[in-house]
Amino acid sequence: RSGKTVAMTVGFIMWAMTRFDGCNFAICGKTIESLRRNVTSNLPVWLAGVFSFKEHRTENKIVVSANGKSNSFYLFGGKDESSAALIQGITLAGILLDEVALMPESFVNQATARCSVEGAKLWFNCNPEGPSHWFYTKWVLEASRRKMLHLHFTMDDNLSLSASVKARYESLYSGVFYDRFIRGLWVVAEGLIYTMFNKDFHVVPSVPRPYEKYVMSCDYGTINPTSIGLWGKAGGKWYRMREYYY
């Protein structure tokens, strides 16, 4: 409820229409249905009197026009690994990924690789997940190196929310959900089995070691995925050498 979707979408459309003419852009969500429901169906309201919008539903395309300029905005859903194939081939001048943390990394990598027009920019928004999430480690923490502008939205940035509404939302959450959805922090989820996991400490290079003993571990995972590991003991430490994950 920080208003990030409105701010980012309006900003993206206005930037695209100011800088380009006759170009293709992409707006991506978890699914095209959720994208239409939460984002694109509201564009004529958010930008009333500024741009004209014409939707071509069979092509999943919206043509935006104003002052003699016209650009096409294609809609894509990034719900699973197979979605990456759907966005291949198109050349883009910019892309907006709404709720990017819900999308697989393969889709995002393919989508960002489509932006080859001179002056193209990448726009992302999301609610935080865990601190080991790929988008946090590879994009948020690398914002400076990637020359990205990182904006942290909270409910206080949404001037349309009254004090009573904000207070009600704050009372709905506690613990990790409060930290993520109210404070906007990338924190570890409660209930994780290995909350102490630290990638810098627990992940080591795969090199030959004088293993003296081997064991197999298996977590069947009645609800969660099955995980089978081959462990080797060397120098008083156990190393997970191989794994099967299904």
PLM segments and residue spans:
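Conserved P-loop
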Residues: 1-61, 136-137
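Catalytic P-loop NTPase motifs of RecA-like helicase/translocase cores
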Residues: 3, 35, 102-104, 131-132, ...
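Inter-Walker segment of RecA-like/P-loop motor cores
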Residues: 34-93, 186
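Walker B catalytic acidic pair
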Residues: 98-99
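ASCE P-loop NTPase helicase motor core
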Residues: 102-172
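ATPase catalytic-site recognition across NTP-hydrolyzing enzymes
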Residues: 158-218
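Short acidic, Gly/Ser-rich segments with clustered Asp/Glu that frequently serve as metal-coordination loops
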Residues: 216-226
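Nucleic-acid-processing active sites and adjacent nucleic-acid-binding tracks
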Residues: 230-246
